[in-house]
């Protein structure tokens, strides 16, 4: 988190007393939006824990979500190497874009961010039971049934691969990942923790290889 005294170290001169701010989802790493802050906006952001921008058209502060309720809860604030741009990691409380999208940056590419959106739906089905939801029925049946489904889908994925059936492999892999995410949330975990663990393993492997090169 950026400390309050660090305000003095930021370069406010390049854009007439303002600093560009990039807002990024802390969980999915999706870039949500871009805005500007002056010193008052940054101070308010740090004090309230909610992202507040400076409107260049209205010449006033505005807290994201003050009308829609879709606030951006601050997780971490960092600066770039030139101290003239901020990156704020947030937990978005609803849709960030006024068009109803999670991000103001529209992309037609499907990526891992979709997996995190799927997680949101799965978590909602876990907490709010629906008679018409297959996911809710899994949680109602309990951990044993969910774990069994993961095992079944894993076997079917293996069989599809052994049969060289690419279309079936994609279908079965999709089922496997879905049920695995359901199981993770059943244990109050999420896929982001898995990604973090993979990153740690990768870093450990790189460090080990570097040590070998030095010997």
UniProtKB/Swiss-Prot annotation:
GO terms for biological process: L-histidine biosynthetic process. Keywords: Amino-acid biosynthesis, ATP-binding, Cytoplasm, Histidine biosynthesis, Hydrolase, Multifunctional enzyme, Nucleotide-binding. Its main location: cytoplasm. Residues 1-114 are annotated as: Phosphoribosyl-AMP cyclohydrolase. GO terms for molecular function: ATP binding; phosphoribosyl-AMP cyclohydrolase activity; phosphoribosyl-ATP diphosphatase activity. It catalyses: 1-(5-phospho-beta-D-ribosyl)-ATP + H2O = 1-(5-phospho-beta-D-ribosyl)-5'-AMP + diphosphate + H(+); 1-(5-phospho-beta-D-ribosyl)-5'-AMP + H2O = 1-(5-phospho-beta-D-ribosyl)-5-[(5-phospho-beta-D-ribosylamino)methylideneamino]imidazole-4-carboxamide. It holds the Pfam family PRA-PH. Residues 115-215 are annotated as: Phosphoribosyl-ATP pyrophosphohydrolase. One of its GO terms (cellular component) is cytoplasm. Gene3D superfamilies: MazG-like, Phosphoribosyl-AMP cyclohydrolase. Pathway: Amino-acid biosynthesis; L-histidine biosynthesis; L-histidine from 5-phospho-alpha-D-ribose 1-diphosphate: step 2/9; Amino-acid biosynthesis; L-histidine biosynthesis; L-histidine from 5-phospho-alpha-D-ribose 1-diphosphate: step 3/9. It is an enzyme of class 3 (hydrolase). Its EC number is 3.5.4.19, 3.6.1.31. It is found in: Cytoplasm. In the N-terminal section; belongs to the PRA-CH family. In the C-terminal section; belongs to the PRA-PH family. This is Histidine biosynthesis bifunctional protein HisIE.
């Amino acid at each position: 988190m950026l400390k309050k005294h660090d305000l003095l170290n930021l370069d406010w001169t390049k854009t007439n007393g303002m600093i560009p701010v990039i807002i990024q989802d802390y969980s999915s790493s999706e870039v949500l939006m871009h805005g500007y802050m002056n010193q008052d906006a940054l101070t308010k952001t740090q004090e309230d824990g909610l992202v507040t921008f400076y409107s260049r058209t209205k010449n006033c502060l505005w807290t994201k979500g003050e009308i829609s309720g879709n606030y951006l809860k601050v997780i971490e604030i960092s600066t770039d190497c030139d101290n003239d741009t901020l990156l704020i990691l947030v937990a978005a409380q609803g849709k960030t874009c006024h068009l109803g999208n999670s991000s103001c940056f529209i992309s037609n590419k499907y990526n891992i961010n979709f997996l995190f959106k799927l997680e949101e739906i799965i978590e909602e089905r876990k907490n709010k039971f629906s008679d018409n939801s297959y996911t809710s029925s899994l949680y109602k049946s309990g951990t044993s049934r969910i774990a069994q489904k993961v095992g079944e889908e894993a076997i079917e994925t293996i069989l599809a691969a052994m049969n060289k059936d690419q279309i079936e492999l994609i279908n079965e892999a999709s089922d496997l990942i879905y049920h695995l995410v359901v199981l993770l949330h059943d244990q109050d975990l999420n896929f982001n923790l898995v990604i973090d663990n993979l990153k740690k393993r990768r870093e450990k492997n790189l460090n080990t290889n570097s040590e070998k090169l030095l010997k």
